Amino acid sequence: MTESLDGIKERALREIASARDTETLQSVSVKYLGRKGAVTLFLRNLSQLPAEERPRAGQAANQVKQDLQAALDRATEQIAADSAAVDGIDVSLPGRPVSRGTLHPITRITRRICEIFGRMGFDVVEGPEIETDYYNFEALNIPKHHPARDMQDTFYISDNVVLRTHTSPTQPRVMEKTAPPLRIIAPGKVYRCDSDVTHTPMFHQVEGLMVDRNVSFGDLKGILTLFIHRMFDPETSLRFRPSYFPFTEPSAEVDIRCVACRGKGCRICSHTGWLEILGAGMVHPAVFEKAGYDTQAYTGFAFGMGVERIAMLKYNIDDTRKFFENDTRFLRQF
């Protein structure tokens, strides 16, 4: 009878494990533990055993009964938990869309600048952000004791190493390794000791350089005019003003008609109707000489612009610091 009891337990546990609802479990309980169940009948038949075997068989039967009841209780709880989890899902509720990131406005503008000049034959190059004094200043005709070298304008790492103050150092680096003709633009981060509504200690620039035979200021004006019309609007008015940069001669500032007031005068343009957008000029012969270029055979022009400045005008943003605050309410607009 003991072997028969083991068989009863094995069959009952299999049926409990395969049950998928409480009704099935109730049937299993009646089948094995009910008044006419297999375990109950086994206990009733103990009188047929020899007297010396009855205690051991009775103890085994009661243990099987307890084991089966415990298995039934666990299965009932699991089925109830599974049912509650399913019932807790309201399939009629609208789904939650996955939140997707977008390109930062500075990245958008930088890529757009590279795209426009890329269509005009300019290659994109990059340079180190930690730069030597020579490439950041000397190679660009910025001599010792020039105001741009002052501590209030430049982050010095050591006496001869700085965080680059512009992306212009890329130009002499490329010219030393590349014979003309060449057309390059150099986007990247730059650093200056400055922080206010329109300036941050770290910002982004794009420098451009074109060198070839017979390159003129007229070529510079034509390329920059085309760039501005493609970046903003074909009807955008612009003007070139005389200026000074150590690495270009002659030099110019380029202004566009104020995008906010359309030239009528407002707070953004200081009531002049114009907004400065970039600086440019013909490459100074001293820069060519340091790079090993023949100043009698080649001429060229260079230009530089602040990406934040372009983005502020493009998107009508009044504070450059918004680009660096990581406010998703602001960034989600782009």
From Swiss-Prot:
GO BP term, example: phenylalanyl-tRNA aminoacylation
Keywords: Aminoacyl-tRNA synthetase, ATP-binding, Cytoplasm, Ligase, Magnesium, Metal-binding, Nucleotide-binding, Protein biosynthesis
EC nos: 6.1.1.20
Main location: cytoplasm
Reaction(s) this enzyme catalyzes, per UniProt: tRNA(Phe) + L-phenylalanine + ATP = L-phenylalanyl-tRNA(Phe) + AMP + diphosphate + H(+)
Cofactor requirements of the protein: Mg(2+)
Subcellular location, record wording: Cytoplasm
Annotated PANTHER family: PHENYLALANINE--TRNA LIGASE, MITOCHONDRIAL, PHENYLALANYL-TRNA SYNTHETASE
Subunit structure: Tetramer of two alpha and two beta subunits.
Name of the molecule in the record: Phenylalanine--tRNA ligase alpha subunit
Source organism (scientific name): Desulfosudis oleivorans (strain DSM 6200 / JCM 39069 / Hxd3)
Gene name, Swiss-Prot/TrEMBL: pheS
